[in-house]
């Protein structure tokens, strides 16, 4: 029998301690991983609701189990809000993750062995855009395009490769690209070779929802996103389309269920609905505008301190810092900043001489720090601290600088908590 006052603390102290330690880590560290954000207490409340108990195979009004009347309300609410948010005609809120959403799109539109053309992981793409270690590079014949020496997508390279390999599907989108993608140009190339255009907007979905980054829906056949990055919701996936082709919509439905997934996670869909409601509110646009302002402010500091920023700037929530000129590695920078309670991720940069697990750069993103209240002055100061640590790498004062920086980080984290009590 269950009781409402059951807790993890008195039942599983080892697990409870790990949860408490993670809570403290998040409060005392500055989070700059571009793919991470803080979910609101309302989102977490929905994730912990009784919907976690409900099996609901199928879709609203067409379930394989009884007792789904309230699950239907939740899912339809999430669908309708996502349609309004992005201007979509078709929405599927069931994918458990962005990768599963992408797998469903491939399964709906093309067959095993067909050719796809996507951005090279080393140039800012994603594993699921055709990387050889991913299902997308194993099941399908993947051809990769990249960026120029200036850090910009080479659309002529995309076009030439499309003409050469005649892909059935072109993937646009990224995990580490700081500029604006020309969705219309990508569709023009896709139409020229008779390919589908599939856009993965996971990293910039929040900016798109706020009207601060071009919406790919008018140009793409199908669009996917995660719901936890700039959107700031639960960890999950989403498929959208406005192509007007009912056959594609039907294929997408069946490719999610039953082809790739069984029962949807109704508690996560409820959390997605909460997230979409928040994204429709006026203050959401202000938040996303501040995300971009903060990223631009940090870029200027890094450049002033002599560090190269890939593509020389940013038009979204992230940017890459290259250490090739300094002879540093992303791995060393990641570790040193981590000791100072600043969390980033090492990242490959164009013409990177280092191995993928070492790299010559870091990726920096501002959704999380902006969510906890950092303004432009705060992030300029933060970028300066980061440069102090990077400047000291390998020098006698390295540990001293790291210790001093950590004290500054703890102070600002105390002033700007993630979840104020």
Swiss-Prot record:
Q: In which pathway does it act?
A: One-carbon metabolism; tetrahydrofolate interconversion; Amino-acid biosynthesis; glycine biosynthesis; glycine from L-serine: step 1/1
Cite the SUPFAM superfamilies for this sequence: PLP-dependent transferases
Membrane spanning residue stretches: none
Where on this chain does (6S)-5,6,7,8-tetrahydrofolate bind?
121, 125-127
GO terms (molecular function) for this protein are: glycine hydroxymethyltransferase activity; pyridoxal phosphate binding
Instruction: Report the principal subcellular site.
Output: cytoplasm
Going by the UniProt record, its keywords in alphabetical order are: Amino-acid biosynthesis, Cytoplasm, One-carbon metabolism, Pyridoxal phosphate, Transferase
Compartmental location: Cytoplasm
Q: Name one GO cellular component term.
A: cytosol
Q: Site: Plays an important role in substrate specificity. Where?
A: 228
Q: What class of enzyme is it?
A: transferase
Query: What binding partners and quaternary form does the record give?
Result: Homodimer.
Family assignment? Belongs to the SHMT family.
* Record's protein name: Serine hydroxymethyltransferase
